[in-house]
């Protein structure tokens, strides 16, 4: 038999306090914030403005004035951001808006985009 040492990586021993107790080193980890997504509502020629305002109030918690301003931006510019959320929340909001529009018989479209 040979007197070879097992092939182990060169790992430094953990620091100790001089009395045999190992001192744990704290390592800071950078955690990236979650990506955020804009929920965007698109204009169409058929969905009533009142329905759009109601959706903005109900699903995005905008007050009447803010909901009306967003609705007008959708109407005049063709689209507007309703809110910015994490991916799961944004996807849920899009589905809720589209489901409400389908139930009401409106073609209202809502999408999400990386903010």
From Swiss-Prot:
Family matches, as InterPro entries: ClpS, ClpS_core, Ribosomal_bL12_C/ClpS-like
GO BP terms in the entry: protein catabolic process; proteolysis
Domain of life of the source: Bacteria
Cross-referenced SUPFAM superfamilies: ClpS-like (SSF54736)
Gene3D superfamilies, A to Z: 3.30.1390.10
Family: Belongs to the ClpS family.
Function of the molecule: Involved in the modulation of the specificity of the ClpAP-mediated ATP-dependent protein degradation.
Subunit structure: Binds to the N-terminal domain of the chaperone ClpA.
Protein name in UniProt: ATP-dependent Clp protease adapter protein ClpS
């Amino acid at each position: 038999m040979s007197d070879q040492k097992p092939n182990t990586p060169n790992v430094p021993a953990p620091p100790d306090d001089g009395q045999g107790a190992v001192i744990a080193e704290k390592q800071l980890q950078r955690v990236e914030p979650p990506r955020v997504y804009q929920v965007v509502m698109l204009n169409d020629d058929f969905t009533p403005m009142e329905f759009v305002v109601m959706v903005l109030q109900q699903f995005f918690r905008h007050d009447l004035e803010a909901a009306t301003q967003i609705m007008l931006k959708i109407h005049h510019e063709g689209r507007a951001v309703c809110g910015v959320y994490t991916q799961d929340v944004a996807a849920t909001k899009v589905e809720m808006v589209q489901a409400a529009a389908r139930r009401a018989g409106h073609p209202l479209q809502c999408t999400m985009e990386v903010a």
